């Protein structure tokens, strides 16, 4: 029976996605203009929910296409303007450059990373110890590097492990070419493969949460930290000290949670590395060590020096993150002899689809701003006073960061609080305490969903996610114990007066000094 033109259109639309998903997206495109005509505010929230739905279906269809169609329509019907979308992208150019260049830069340091992490996994047999190592290493690195950079490193390592195992389990040798995305080979043991996928899922989730634990502590850990630090006129050390009454107890609670979920094998954790897989990885390590020439050793040395430059450059903020990433690409390729354009191009394959998706995400953020979707929440939070106000801001930030980008939420809130300070609604000391509540509120509860943490969203839409069956729902479920513990410990640190008392202690001992309103007036406005 010949295919009609309408059937061909439906077949082509969003490719191999399920039919119900195609119908859902077409329905959204029909409903949205009607709702916008009746009530723009409701239409704005509807768009946010629809966009979250496209992210949740990331394994069925990459969110760029359905999310992009919704964003294009939002601009077309007037929910926001092209100039506002461009302004959002402009304001977040550093994040986009980070994705384009830093992730590609990490690609050229893969050999060193695989070398280090393979040793970690093959030499340490205790799953609990390996999990704690991944979580604490990610937290430490995220305090000095950007969380996206760290998660890109861990993803590169996981893809390396997976492809090595898949190649050998499919009956090939380490040196053979192989497509590790295809499970058609007869030799693959399904049970073994599932256990290994589960093991990698565990490590990636521990590492992802680790980036949040470390990222909240310093002003370079997350993009919104830089914005908040600029508005409050804090330097690196002062930022870390002011955050510590909340971040230190939260860090230890997070590490303890990592231990508990592994020990009691709950929320999908506790999956062991199968013995056969461990043998393959150990054999690979021995194989690599045996055939490593002086050329290979020199490459590792060069990559180690570039790694030192990367950490120093980012920790001292010698240039914007994206530009440091570009320098990593240039140094790693120049000194390791990668001069072929095709070989260079491979490095960019992983990050560019996500960069495009993030640009679409900023279009949704533009709608949130133009339709003032968060305005009622902010006004409600400002109606409280004192310590209660800090708790309310922490909770309000946390809830909004679960559904929206935490960079955006943090930026909107700090600018609103700054406006309240300049209009005399709050004191300068209260502003400083609110800045801590906003920073911790945007960083910690946002681990709940991939929407809030860019590192989680990058993990969800990366090449490794479908290979290890890491879906949106599974990420939310595996993040749940961390979400509960981090959110509660964070709110208790503020609620029980720990933040106010410790901040007063820092003032009394002249560890930090009181700031004036003049500092805020003079500070760089990073407003959207």
Swiss-Prot record:
Q: Which reaction does it catalyse?
A: 2 Na(+)(in) + 3 H(+)(out) = 2 Na(+)(out) + 3 H(+)(in)
User: What is the membrane topology noted in the UniProt record heading this document?
Assistant: Multi-pass membrane protein
Record Pfam families: NhaB
Span of the signal peptide: none
Q: Which UniProt keywords apply?
A: Antiport, Cell inner membrane, Cell membrane, Ion transport, Membrane, Sodium, Sodium transport, Transmembrane, Transmembrane helix, Transport
Keyword check for Transmembrane: yes
The molecular function terms of the Gene Ontology recorded here are: sodium:proton antiporter activity
Tell me where it resides. Cell inner membrane
The record's GO CC annotations read: plasma membrane
Function of the protein: Na(+)/H(+) antiporter that extrudes sodium in exchange for external protons.
Entry-linked NCBIfam families: NhaB, PRK09547.1
Name of protein: Na(+)/H(+) antiporter NhaB
């Amino acid at each position: 029976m010949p295919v009609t033109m309408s059937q061909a259109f439906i077949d082509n639309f969003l490719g191999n996605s399920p039919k119900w998903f195609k119908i859902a997206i077409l329905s959204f495109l029909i409903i949205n203009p009607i709702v916008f005509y009746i009530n723009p505010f409701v239409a704005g929230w509807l768009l946010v929910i629809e966009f979250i739905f496209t992210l949740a279906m990331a394994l069925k269809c990459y969110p760029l296409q359905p999310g992009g169609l919704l964003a294009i329509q939002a601009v077309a019907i007037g929910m926001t303007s092209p100039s506002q979308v461009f302004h959002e992208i402009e304001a977040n150019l550093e994040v986009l450059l980070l994705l384009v260049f830093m992730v590609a830069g990490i690609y050229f340091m893969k050999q060193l990373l695989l070398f280090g992490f393979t040793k970690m996994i093959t030499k340490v047999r205790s799953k609990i110890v390996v999990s704690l190592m991944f979580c604490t290493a990610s937290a430490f690195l995220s305090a000095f590097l950007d969380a996206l950079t760290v998660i890109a490193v861990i993803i590169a390592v996981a893809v390396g492990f997976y492809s090595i195992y898949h190649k050998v389990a499919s009956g090939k040798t380490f040196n053979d070419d192989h497509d590790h995305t295809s499970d058609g080979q007869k030799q693959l043991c399904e049970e073994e493969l599932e256990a290994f996928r589960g093991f990698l899922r565990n490590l990636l989730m521990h590492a992802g949460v680790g980036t949040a634990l470390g990222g909240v502590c310093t002003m370079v850990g997350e993009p919104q930290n830089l914005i908040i630090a600029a508005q409050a006129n804090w330097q690196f050390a002062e930022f870390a000290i002011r955050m510590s009454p909340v971040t230190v107890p939260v860090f230890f609670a997070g590490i303890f949670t990592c231990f508990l979920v592994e020990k009691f094998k709950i929320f999908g954790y506790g999956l062991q590395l199968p013995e056969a897989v461990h043998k393959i990885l150990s054999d690979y390590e021995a194989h690599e060590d045996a055939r490593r020439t002086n050329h290979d050793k020199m490459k590792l040395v060069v990559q180690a020096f570039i790694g030192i430059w990367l950490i120093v450059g980012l920790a001292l903020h010698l240039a914007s993150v994206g530009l440091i990433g570009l320098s990593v690409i240039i140094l790693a390729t120049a000194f390791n002899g990668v001069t072929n354009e095709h070989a260079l191009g491979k490095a960019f394959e992983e990050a560019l689809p996500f960069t495009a998706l993030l640009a679409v995400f900023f279009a949704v953020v533009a709608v949130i701003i133009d339709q003032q979707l968060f305005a009622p929440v902010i006004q409600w939070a400002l109606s409280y006073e004192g310590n209660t106000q800090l708790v309310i801001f922490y909770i309000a930030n946390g809830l909004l960061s679960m559904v929206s980008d935490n960079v955006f939420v943090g930026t909107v809130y700090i600018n609103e609080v700054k406006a309240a300070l300049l209009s005399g609604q709050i004191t300068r000391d209260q502003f400083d305490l609110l800045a801590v509540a906003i920073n911790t509120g945007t960083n910690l509860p946002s681990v709940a969903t991939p929407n809030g943490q860019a590192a989680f969203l990058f993990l969800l839409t990366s090449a490794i996610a479908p290979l290890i069956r890491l879906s949106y729902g599974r990420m939310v479920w595996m993040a749940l114990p961390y979400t509960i513990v981090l959110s509660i410990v964070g709110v208790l640190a503020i609620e029980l007066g720990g933040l106010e008392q410790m901040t007063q202690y820092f003032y009394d001992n002249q560890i930090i000094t009181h700031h004036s309103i003049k500092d805020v007036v003079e500070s760089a406005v990073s407003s959207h």
